[in-house]
């Protein structure tokens, strides 16, 4: 049995988190993680939103949100509509192209995670989910 010190375990966990951020997402070349998150928000939570709401929802600066929205608009994944009365106000909507890209990308990611679940098996997958729940609980306490 290998006994690891806390520092060594923390380092392994740090490396693992980096791997998990890269590997399942690697195939998603069309879209960044931030873009994917915003398209997911527009797909599952609200069909229309504004930059301020996205900034608050994702805890990002308004500048970062603006850059991401501009990128999504250039790719024609969202449509930005200015308020007819107050041109400073903008509403953002997901387009059909955006929905297709989101669905395709989500399906690819889920397929990757399905392969992981198959590799781990039911017992280890359930253990992993239990540990992930504890990790979420830990960070939600902060």
Predicted regions and their residues:
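N-terminal helix-turn-helix DNA-binding core of bacterial DNA-binding proteins
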Residues: 22-64
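Charged, amphipathic alpha-helical coiled-coil/dimerization segments
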Residues: 71-130
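Alpha-helical linker/hinge and terminal dimerization helices associated
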Residues: 13-24, 58, 101, 105-117, ...
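N-terminal leader segment of winged-helix/HTH proteins
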Residues: 1-29
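N-terminal positioning helix adjacent to the helix-turn-helix/winged-helix DNA-binding module
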Residues: 12, 31-35, 97, 124
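C-terminal regulatory/oligomerization modules of transcriptional regulators
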Residues: 1-4, 8, 123-142
């Amino acid at each position: 049995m290998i006994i690891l010190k806390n520092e060594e375990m923390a380092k392994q966990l740090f490396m693992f988190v980096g791997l998990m951020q890269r590997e399942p997402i690697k195939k998603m070349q069309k879209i960044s993680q931030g873009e994917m998150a915003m398209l997911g928000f527009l797909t599952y939570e609200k069909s229309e939103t504004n930059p301020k709401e996205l900034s608050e929802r994702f805890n990002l600066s308004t500048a970062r949100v603006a850059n991401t929205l501009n990128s999504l608009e250039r790719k024609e994944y969202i449509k930005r509509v200015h308020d007819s009365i107050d041109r400073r106000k903008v509403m953002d909507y997901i387009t059909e192209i955006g929905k297709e890209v989101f669905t395709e990308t989500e399906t690819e990611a889920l397929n990757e995670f399905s392969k992981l679940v198959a590799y781990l098996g039911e017992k280890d997958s359930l253990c992993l989910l239990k540990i992930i729940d504890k990790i979420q609980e830990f960070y939600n306490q902060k």
